[in-house]
Structure formats: C-alpha cells, structure tokens
UniProtKB/Swiss-Prot annotation:
Compositional bias per record (Basic and acidic residues), positions renumbered to this chain: 73-83, 232-245
Family: Belongs to the RRP15 family.
Example of a GO biological process term: maturation of LSU-rRNA
Protein name in UniProt: RRP15-like protein
Natural source organism: Drosophila pseudoobscura pseudoobscura (Fruit fly)
One Gene Ontology CC term in the entry: preribosome, large subunit precursor
Amino acid sequence: MALLTAKRPKKEAAPATDTSNNESDSEDSQNVDGDTGANAGWADCIGKVLKSKSVGPTVLSRAKKNPAVVRSKTSEAAKKPGFDFEVVGGDVKEEDDDDEEDGDADKSALDATLTKTERRNVPLQLRVKPSYQDLERERTLRKVATRGVVQFFNAVRIQQKDLEQQLADAGPLDSRQDAVLNNINKRKFLDVLMSGKRAKSTAIDNAVKKEEQETDDDDEDDTAEASSTGKKKSEWNVLREDFMTNKKIKHWDEEDDEGSDQGANNDEADDSDDDDEED
C-alpha cells in the first residue's frame, strides 16, 4: 500500500508537466513567427537594394528592338576613347567591306565546285613532280658540275705551285718578288683552267640563248673584236687591260696642244698683218 501511495502523486504531477511543455511550445512558436517575419522583411530590403537593372539573356531576333539592350550598346560606344585630331583639306574615306565579302563569296563558290581530292591538291599545283625521263639529263648535269669543280681546284693548285716556284727562284729580294707578283695574269690562269685533260665541253639538250651583238661607234677596235667574236660586250671599257694603250686615248693631250699651237700661230699671223697695214 505504501508503494501505491508513493506512485500516485507522480501520476497526478504529470498534467503539470504537460501544461508547462505546451506553454514552452507556444512561446517558441511565437518566437519563430517573429523571427520569420523579421527575416522576410530583411530579405525584401536586401532584394530591393541588390536588385540589378540589367536584363537577362534575350532572344537574338528581339535584341535590336529591346530598348535596354540598345541603351547598353550606346553607353559602351560612348565609353570608347575617341581621336583628338581633325582632318584638314581632305576627305575621310570609309573602308568598304564589299571587296572582302566578294572574295569570301568567290572562295566559297570555288570550294563548292571542287571535290574533296581537288581541294586537297590545290596547294600542290605549283609543284612539279620529277619524271623518269629526266634522270639521264640530271645525271649528265651532275657529272658536268663535278668535273668543273675538280678542274677548277686543280687549276688553283697548279697556279699556287707555279707562283711558289717563281718566288723561290726570284730570291729574297723584295723587288724581284714584287715583279713576280705583278706578272700574275688572269688569262694565264684561264689558260691553265682550260688546258686540262678534262677540259672539254659537253652538249646538253637545254641550249643557252645567244646574246645579241652590240657595236660601239666610238671605238673601232671594239667593233672589230665584237664582229669577229660575235659576243656581247658586258665589260666596262675602263676596266679593260688595254684601256691606257688605246690609240684614241694615247695621244689625247697632243691633239689639244696642236690645236692650241695652231690657234696661237693664227693669232700671231693676224697681228702681223694688222701691223703691216698700219705702217
């Protein structure tokens, strides 16, 4: 019985705890309602402050008609820096893009007419593929080039040996060595070059064009040589070896002296005639 009496007060105290819980729940709900109301008002204020005036993505077909888009483009154009100079006395020409458009249209039309393989071979049109028929000609040209190089170096070696031998025979005197060095002639080297065992010309199917003959009326010797050889004179006359020994240049000062002497004699004769008349 004592146990039952001890348990009964606990059962009677249970409704008191339920009422306290209900009161706490009601207070919490009121606090939550107050917090949500305050948060909602704060969210509205922040949304109004942070609300952007820029429009979202628009359809491209309607972008030109949208006043907001037009306004943004005009503002961007106004922000671009301008030029601080003026054109005086001239007209400013505006560049036309018609030529570029025409070129693009031509290229597109050409690409449309060509097939895939032809379009791939367009950059290779300037290339020339070697033919098997030209192998003999190429081989002949290689032989000629090799023979010419070998012959040239042999001629240089022979010329150097001859020069060393002549300097050794001349002795230690500088005057004799200078005389030997002055006797070096280009024609001798060419004679040595063309007098070798392999000094022969081979005919190739690709003939060289003949140069036309040019004659000079001022120099008779030049015309005679040109008519005999039939080659074009591409050398300056001053650089020729016989320039100073030419007949016309050899006595150029004597002709002037003779002319001046004749003029002086004529003047003296005129003066003497005048004196005789006065007497």
